Amino acid sequence: MHSELKNVSKHLAELGAGILAQAQKNALYTGYYSHLDEGVLGVMQAAQAAELLIKAAIAKQHPLLIFSSVPKSTSVSGELLSMQDIFEDGKTIQYAELPEKLWATTGYKLPNQDVYKSFGKLRNTIQHFALPKRDVRAETARFIYAVVDPLMGHFWDDYAVNYVDVVEAKDDIFELLSNYGIKPRYPEELKDFAESVE
C-alpha cells in the first residue's frame, strides 16, 4: 500500500466530525439574515457526515475498501497505486450501499437502517428536487442520534454531542434535543448539563 493511503481513515473521521458539527448547528440553532432555512443545510451536512464517518470506519480495515472500483495496474503511473491514480479513476461506494459494506468489513451492523435509508431519500429530495413539507430539523436530529451517534460510540468511543459548532453548546444542547424527544448519550463531563434537563 502506498504511504499516502495510510491516513485516509483518520482524515475521513476528522472531516466527518467537522461536518457533523456544522449539521448540528444548522439543525438545532436558528441564524439570522438567511434566505434559506438552515435546517435544510443540516440535512445535507448530516448525511454527508454519516457517509464520511462510515467510510472512515471501513477504511480502518483498509483504505481501498471504501472504493467500488479502483484503477487497474496497467493504468497507474508508478509501481504502487497512488492517491492521484485513485482521484482520477477510482469510484467510492455510494451512500445506500455503505451499511452493508460496513457490516461486511467490520462486523458492525449500523443501527436504525430504516432511518438511514429514509434520511438518504430526504437528502436526495432536497438536493435534486424540492424542499419537502416536513420538519427537517427534527428529522436531522433524530438521524444524528439514532444512526451517527451509535456509530461514533462504537468506532471512536465518542459522542455526537461533542460536535456542535456553537460556542458553549453544552449549555442548551440537551434541552434542544429534548424538544425533539431525544435523550442522547453523553460523556461524563457533560453529565450535569444533561441531568439538568431531565
Tell where the protein language model's regions lie, with residue ranges:
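Active-site-adjacent bridging/hinge elements
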Residues: 13-27, 119-124
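Secondary-structure edge/capping motif, primarily at the C-terminal ends of alpha-helices
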Residues: 23-34, 61, 126-133
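Short, solvent-exposed secondary-structure capping/transition elements
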Residues: 54-67, 135-138, 161
